[in-house]
Amino acid sequence: MAPSRRLLTSVSLLSILILLLAVWSLRSGAVTLDFSQVFSALLGSAPRNITMVVTEWRLPRVAMAILVGAALGVSGAIFQSLMRNPLGSPDVMGLNTGAWSGVLVAMVLFGQHLTAITFTAMAGGILTSLLIWALAWRNGIDTFRLIIIGIGIRAMLMAFNTWLLLQASLETALSAGLWYAGSLNGLTWGKTWPAAPLIVLMFIGALLLVRRMRLLEMGDDSACALGVGVERSRLMLMLVAVLLTAASTAIAGPISFIALVAPHIARRLSGTARWGLTQAALCGALLLLAADLCAQRLFMPYQLPVGVVTVSLGGIYLIVLLVQESRKK
């Protein structure tokens, strides 16, 4: 199959799978609905109680699973492109832990104030990335050193987060603990503001910068010869990736491994780097939607935080990836 046809097939297949999983998620739960009831509720012609179940309880969760998964997929693709390293992702480097530190500070100081949570998550992610970048700088950036320092910063931030939880009230600690596991439980449309619009804005920013990202993949000298400001472009792309991670953390907590795994699966499916961000977004959305469905259904009537499922599957994938990289060397 020609690459262009294979690319189109993979994008179409991912989109169809996302749509099917989304509809299945809307009909399944403590109250199982027919497909006709789901579509009637979406069109506003179902009874009021069914419409409320679908549009107010389940649809926000499904929509945010797709949006957050896509955001993490794009963020991971940008990091792996900039670092030229398959282990380059915001969760491995600790950026989502930094964003979570910001969320935790906001919850301790301001309670569950959504605007404060979003902006402190952004601040935490940006400050963490600047700290990692500053410590890794030695007349330039070596990606291996950057990742190792990121892992170290992540460990220190986890210790800081544990200390904050111990200082918080019992109610705040319980809420923060559930959020820390990475959860889409209890999401409503009101809880998506202002993080969801920020993710959409960052998607637009990523699309505007995708050409620069592809030129940077050719090497700094080649990109510079083609008129690209290397450091400025790298900084803008990094900012977009960090804000995508921070906004996702503000909505659902620090969900791990989606950003690491989605770009790899996207490349394997398509066999090309073209449309890399689109493929990574679709893979991320599909992975998180599937993980959330598993978290809801596997242990009924109990529901797991979706982060437990992604960590379990992502940990296995990370081991396989490390073994493959060691064999190459």
Would you name each region that the model predicts?
Residues 1-329:
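Alpha-helical transmembrane segments in inner-membrane proteins
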